């Protein structure tokens, strides 16, 4: 199945009017509306941005995926139907130093690679999952006790370059670091629907009010 097409066509998590995403003005981050959720992330130099939805914060590959559309303001956007509070999501980005290749797949692929960093400082790497800088909540830290004790991985996976990564005490087969897919392990952004109850504004007559500093 082609990258970016693994998602429902109707109902929960289905795209809502994708033909309008390029001209939309959704604010940055994930915004929960009445029946839909909008996603928006800024990148001037990215050439493709993939939104991924996860069922668990750690240990699983992405469940759904969507290509975001770039607006004239260099903000990449999408709108999905009925994305519930607490949903985990993240992004993968391609850029001038690592353009999208039809052969690229999740799971330690180097397809499309040109350089770890180019003359303009671009360091795009689709194998390194990115959380939303405007997320209201993250699922976990870059390195957790569970990651180390149960899965024998550490934060060394997030690096790039030609050397090899093989986990803690070389428990895993060595993989060129730039190609190691951090998707199952990286921190995920969390969709948060603000349900904060601010209460009812007190109505106190002026003669009974007190000013406190």
What feature does the model see in each segment?
Residues 15, 60, 64:
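Catalytic cores of carbohydrate-active enzymes across secretory and cytosolic contexts
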Residues 42-48, 83:
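Short proline/glycine-enriched turn/loop motifs at strand-loop junctions of beta-rich domains
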Residues 2-34, 73-75, 82-213:
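The feature marks proteins involved in alpha-glucan
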Residues 64-71, 78:
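Short, surface-exposed loop motifs enriched in S/T, G, D/E and P with embedded aromatic residues
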């Amino acid at each position: 199945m082609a990258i970016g097409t693994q998602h429902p066509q109707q109902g929960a998590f289905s795209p809502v009017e994708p033909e309008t995403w390029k001209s939309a003005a959704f604010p940055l981050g994930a915004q929960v509306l009445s029946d839909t959720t909008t996603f928006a992330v800024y990148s001037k130099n990215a050439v493709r941005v993939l939104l991924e939805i996860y069922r668990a914060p750690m240990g699983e590959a992405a469940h759904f995926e969507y290509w975001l559309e770039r607006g004239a303001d260099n903000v990449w956007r999408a709108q999905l139907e009925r994305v519930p509070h607490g949903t985990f999501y993240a992004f993968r980005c391609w850029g001038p130093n690592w353009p999208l290749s039809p052969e690229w797949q999740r799971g330690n692929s180097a397809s499309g690679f040109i350089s770890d960093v180019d003359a303009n400082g671009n360091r795009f790497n689709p194998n390194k999952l990115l959380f939303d800088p405007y997320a209201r909540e993250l699922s976990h830290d870059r390195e957790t006790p569970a990651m180390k004790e149960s899965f024998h991985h550490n934060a060394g996976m997030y690096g790039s370059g030609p050397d090899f990564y093989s986990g803690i005490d070389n428990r895993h087969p060595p993989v060129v670091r730039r190609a190691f897919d951090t998707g199952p392990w990286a921190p995920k952004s969390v969709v948060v629907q603000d349900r904060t109850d601010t209460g009812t504004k007190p109505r106190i007559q002026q003669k009974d009010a007190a000013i406190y500093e």
